[in-house]
Amino acid sequence: MQEIIIQVMNQFGYFGVAFLIMIENIFPPIPSEVILTFGGFMTTYSELGIIGMIIAATIGSVLGALILYFVGRLLSVERLERLVSGRLGKVLRLKPEDITKAEKWFLKRGYATIFFCRFIPLIRSLISVPAGSAKMKLPSFLILTTLGTLIWNIVLVSLGAALGDNWEMIAGILDSYSSVVVAILGVIFILGLLLFVKKRFFPKNKNYSPDSEK
């Protein structure tokens, strides 16, 4: 994977960077850390510049985020509510009100979420889908996405340029960081799933009292 990424970047320059970063947003397993840090290193031996590299990466990030945003718009809250109001909702123990609550939560805290999640592996890409489903205003989404990805790109491209031949060291550190974050997210997901199952399938009987068994 890394060799293919480097070949594309060497051959297509800025366009290759923008394309790869766009695909990385849609297909998170592609390592953006390698693209950005190697992109920074490329500026030390080619005609490509740091500013151009950052701009290309940011354009690619925003385009990829927009694709997922509109995927979220297709999978709207209204459609989700219709889905859970039928048999699927009974199986999952979900109600239309649950979808509405989730939408309200996202609209209340979604602006900060969109910005800060741009620094978290995996979530960085996927957060665009609920933003679209909740119908977050497109200008706000674009501004927050651009700011978050711009900061991320500036840091990694600059580190790659500063370290030169040692750019892979940063990519390795960030890969370890990504693995830890994904593991933590996995644990949180499992705990959340267990809590959801407990509440839905094993609800507490509020009317229960010791005297009721006598």
Swiss-Prot record:
Top-level taxonomy: Bacteria, Bacillati, Bacillota, Bacilli, Lactobacillales
This protein's name: Alkaline phosphatase-like protein
Main location: membrane
Stored InterPro entries: DedA_domain, VTT_dom
Membrane topology: Multi-pass membrane protein
Subcellular location: Cell membrane
Assigned GO CC terms: plasma membrane
Sequence intervals crossing the membrane: 3-23, 48-68, 141-161, 177-197
